[in-house]
């Protein structure tokens, strides 16, 4: 999310807060390189998440884990659908109305889905910890209902948090080239935007602590299991359990860099504490780490495949059916060559 305090004077210059110095910035990276990178994510994410959604809607919601994964794939698909608007807007290929749409709707939706994904990764982490410590416990109907209610509550909370950001982005642009979404926000819209920024930071850091604590406990439990079964026939099962660490890998690759880069970047926008070169570096770091948050939509399918047995079995069954169907069709088309040979 962009901080209201910053003031960009044109597409290639930006003013350093608290000074009259204009800091030139080369936007070729953000107008060419990042649109290309987002295009790759869009096609890869659309294919993998469409397939994941198709599979998940064939699987019963028989555990909290599957319920949380289903919500995650919906969130990822919504995020992916915002990419084309960002690509066209950043590449300066759309009209001013497109930039207004991005600021008012798709950019808000992007962050809305990001923090939903972060929240569900936190819940999935808790679920995996409970599965590690109590592997034979099954989900009761009351637990499943609780997971569904919690999922609805997360969506409702984030929607109510994000909706004012859409409504309060209601100023008419004075210039066709809108360099910052904050120029379109009302006075209260800027205040609400800042409040939402703080709340989203809290959401991230809460889930960051959940991931750190749960994986510390999971590591401890897996080590105890290793010591107990060392040298026994259960060793292969322990190696399978290591797959659970894919969640923390995705969380740290996608979300941690952005939220650490965001702190000095926000400071550079609101206070004159960095020189021009440092400001530009922080800007590019912020844009790079923001792309990593988008990468989450392409990495989550690996979580589904490695950690969800029902998903993996359904996918393999689908692939086998497709392969056998293709072979059968090929056989029917080819037939027996002797039948086509004239006497």
Swiss-Prot record:
<feature type="transmembrane region" description="Helical; Name=7">
    <location>
        <begin position="285"/>
        <end position="304"/>
    </location>
</feature>
<feature type="binding site">
    <location>
        <position position="99"/>
    </location>
    <ligand>
        <name>ADP</name>
    </ligand>
</feature>
<dbReference type="GO" id="GO:0030168">
    <property type="term" value="P:platelet activation"/>
</dbReference>
<feature type="transmembrane region" description="Helical; Name=1">
    <location>
        <begin position="34"/>
        <end position="56"/>
    </location>
</feature>
<feature type="topological domain" description="Cytoplasmic">
    <location>
        <begin position="214"/>
        <end position="239"/>
    </location>
</feature>
<dbReference type="GO" id="GO:0050921">
    <property type="term" value="P:positive regulation of chemotaxis"/>
</dbReference>
<feature type="binding site">
    <location>
        <position position="269"/>
    </location>
    <ligand>
        <name>ADP</name>
    </ligand>
</feature>
<feature type="binding site">
    <location>
        <position position="193"/>
    </location>
    <ligand>
        <name>ADP</name>
    </ligand>
</feature>
<keyword id="KW-1015">Disulfide bond</keyword>
<feature type="binding site">
    <location>
        <begin position="262"/>
        <end position="265"/>
    </location>
    <ligand>
        <name>ADP</name>
    </ligand>
</feature>
<dbReference type="GO" id="GO:0051897">
    <property type="term" value="P:positive regulation of phosphatidylinositol 3-kinase/protein kinase B signal transduction"/>
</dbReference>
<feature type="transmembrane region" description="Helical; Name=6">
    <location>
        <begin position="240"/>
        <end position="265"/>
    </location>
</feature>
<dbReference type="GO" id="GO:0150063">
    <property type="term" value="P:visual system development"/>
</dbReference>
<dbReference type="GO" id="GO:0070527">
    <property type="term" value="P:platelet aggregation"/>
</dbReference>
<feature type="topological domain" description="Cytoplasmic">
    <location>
        <begin position="305"/>
        <end position="343"/>
    </location>
</feature>
<dbReference type="GO" id="GO:0007186">
    <property type="term" value="P:G protein-coupled receptor signaling pathway"/>
</dbReference>
<comment type="function">
    <text>Receptor for ADP and ATP coupled to G-proteins that inhibit the adenylyl cyclase second messenger system. Required for normal platelet aggregation and blood coagulation.</text>
</comment>
<dbReference type="GO" id="GO:0007193">
    <property type="term" value="P:adenylate cyclase-inhibiting G protein-coupled receptor signaling pathway"/>
</dbReference>
<dbReference type="GO" id="GO:0016020">
    <property type="term" value="C:membrane"/>
</dbReference>
<dbReference type="GO" id="GO:0043270">
    <property type="term" value="P:positive regulation of monoatomic ion transport"/>
</dbReference>
<dbReference type="GO" id="GO:0001609">
    <property type="term" value="F:G protein-coupled adenosine receptor activity"/>
</dbReference>
<feature type="disulfide bond">
    <location>
        <begin position="103"/>
        <end position="181"/>
    </location>
</feature>
<keyword id="KW-0597">Phosphoprotein</keyword>
<feature type="region of interest" description="Disordered">
    <location>
        <begin position="324"/>
        <end position="343"/>
    </location>
</feature>
<dbReference type="GO" id="GO:1904141">
    <property type="term" value="P:positive regulation of microglial cell migration"/>
</dbReference>
<keyword id="KW-0812">Transmembrane</keyword>
<dbReference type="GO" id="GO:0006930">
    <property type="term" value="P:substrate-dependent cell migration, cell extension"/>
</dbReference>
<dbReference type="GO" id="GO:0006811">
    <property type="term" value="P:monoatomic ion transport"/>
</dbReference>
<dbReference type="GO" id="GO:0051924">
    <property type="term" value="P:regulation of calcium ion transport"/>
</dbReference>
<feature type="topological domain" description="Extracellular">
    <location>
        <begin position="169"/>
        <end position="191"/>
    </location>
</feature>
<feature type="topological domain" description="Extracellular">
    <location>
        <begin position="266"/>
        <end position="284"/>
    </location>
</feature>
<feature type="topological domain" description="Cytoplasmic">
    <location>
        <begin position="125"/>
        <end position="148"/>
    </location>
</feature>
<feature type="transmembrane region" description="Helical; Name=3">
    <location>
        <begin position="104"/>
        <end position="124"/>
    </location>
</feature>
<dbReference type="GO" id="GO:0044298">
    <property type="term" value="C:cell body membrane"/>
</dbReference>
<dbReference type="InterPro" id="IPR017452">
    <property type="entry name" value="GPCR_Rhodpsn_7TM"/>
</dbReference>
<dbReference type="InterPro" id="IPR005394">
    <property type="entry name" value="P2Y12_rcpt"/>
</dbReference>
<dbReference type="GO" id="GO:0019722">
    <property type="term" value="P:calcium-mediated signaling"/>
</dbReference>
<dbReference type="GO" id="GO:0045596">
    <property type="term" value="P:negative regulation of cell differentiation"/>
</dbReference>
<feature type="modified residue" description="Phosphoserine">
    <location>
        <position position="61"/>
    </location>
</feature>
<dbReference type="GO" id="GO:0005901">
    <property type="term" value="C:caveola"/>
</dbReference>
<dbReference type="GO" id="GO:0051649">
    <property type="term" value="P:establishment of localization in cell"/>
</dbReference>
<feature type="binding site">
    <location>
        <position position="103"/>
    </location>
    <ligand>
        <name>ADP</name>
    </ligand>
</feature>
């Amino acid at each position: 999310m962009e901080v209201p305090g910053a003031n960009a004077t044109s597409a290639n210059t930006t003013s350093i807060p608290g000074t009259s110095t204009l800091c030139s910035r080369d936007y070729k990276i953000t107008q060419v390189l990042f649109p290309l990178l987002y295009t790759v994510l869009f096609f890869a994410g659309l294919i993998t998440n469409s397939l994941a959604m198709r599979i998940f809607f064939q699987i019963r919601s028989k555990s909290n884990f599957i319920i949380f994964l289903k919500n995650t794939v919906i969130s990822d698909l919504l995020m992916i659908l915002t990419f084309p608007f960002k690509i066209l807007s950043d590449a300066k290929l759309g009209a001013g109305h497109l930039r207004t749409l991005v600021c008012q709707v798709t950019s808000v939706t992007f962050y809305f889905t990001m923090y939903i994904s972060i929240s569900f990764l936190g819940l999935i982490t808790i679920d995996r910890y409970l599965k590690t410590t109590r592997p034979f416990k099954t989900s009761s109907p009351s637990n499943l209902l609780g997971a569904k209610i919690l999922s609805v509550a997360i969506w409702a909370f984030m929607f109510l948090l994000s909706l004012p950001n859409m409504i309060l982005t209601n100023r008419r642009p004075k210039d066709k080239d809108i360099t910052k979404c904050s120029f379109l926000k009302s006075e209260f819209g800027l205040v609400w935007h800042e409040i939402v920024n703080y709340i989203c930071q809290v959401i991230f850091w809460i889930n960051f602590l959940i991931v750190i604590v749960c994986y510390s406990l999971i590591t401890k439990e897996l080590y105890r299991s290793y010591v107990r079964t060392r040298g026994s026939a259960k060793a292969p099962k322990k190696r399978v359990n290591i797959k659970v660490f894919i969640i923390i890998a995705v969380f740290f690759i996608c979300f941690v860099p952005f939220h650490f880069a965001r702190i000095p970047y926000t400071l550079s926008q609101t206070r004159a504490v960095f020189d021009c070169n440092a400001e530009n570096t922080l800007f590019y770091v912020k844009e790079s780490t923001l792309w990593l948050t988008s990468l989450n939509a392409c990495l989550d399918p690996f979580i589904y495949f490695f950690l969800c047995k029902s998903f993996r079995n359904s996918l393999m069954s689908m692939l086998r059916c497709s392969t056998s169907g293709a072979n059968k069709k090929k056989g029917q088309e080819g037939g027996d060559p002797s039948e086509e040979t004239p006497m």
